[in-house]
Amino acid sequence: MLSFVLVAMLAGPFGEQPTPLGSKSDRLIRVYQQGVYSRELVLNLQRAVSRLLDGSGIALAFIDCEGQPICNEGLRRDELVLRLVSGLHPTDSTTCGMAFRGTPGRPGVLMSVYRGCVLKTSKQLRGLALSRTRSTVLLELTEADMLAPIVIHEVVHLLLPGEAHGLGIWQAVLAADDWERLGNGELKLGADLTSRLRAVFSAQAPATHAEGR
């Protein structure tokens, strides 16, 4: 079985940002790319995450922190931090994402996603598709497409630190079948989990991302 592990543990001007001025979201995620930098990656990640969350009533917004003074300010209650690391996890190459979660009373804010793990998984999936043992939809998955469910998974760890793993995006391990479902637009968060996330967000009004906020 092809799988990777998701783990939880106790830039240009604003006009080029993935989150437009004046937009609203439940959480704003500051993105720091470590290693190889790609201006387009955060934009594409925003689109991919929005597609996965379409119809859920949940909105996550991203800001590319490369060269952005706003990212030097202290975090607000509605902000999280995502590190996109170019290589593999230092001790486990199958770990694609980690969330440094807190407690229900003091939730964590930091998650790391390892692009090297995503690339490794992508190559394995392409091999399965080319050998005709899996659907060719796997050949169409982009890096951002594959990053999106991992990032959403880690966000859940941060916002619901005591939540046991479940179905869909919230599985502890995604296998080839799940990546095919992603490619077919069928991999989602479960309805119950979505409701619990919305309950977390309802504790405060949505953020408005405006210049000089």
Can you describe what each PLM-predicted range is?
Residues 1-13:
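Bacterial N-terminal signal peptides
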Residues 11-26:
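Cleaved targeting-peptide boundary
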Residues 22-37, 130-132:
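Acidic/histidine-rich, surface-exposed loop or edge segments in extracytoplasmic proteins
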Residues 39-155, 161:
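Metzincin-family zinc-dependent endopeptidase catalytic domain
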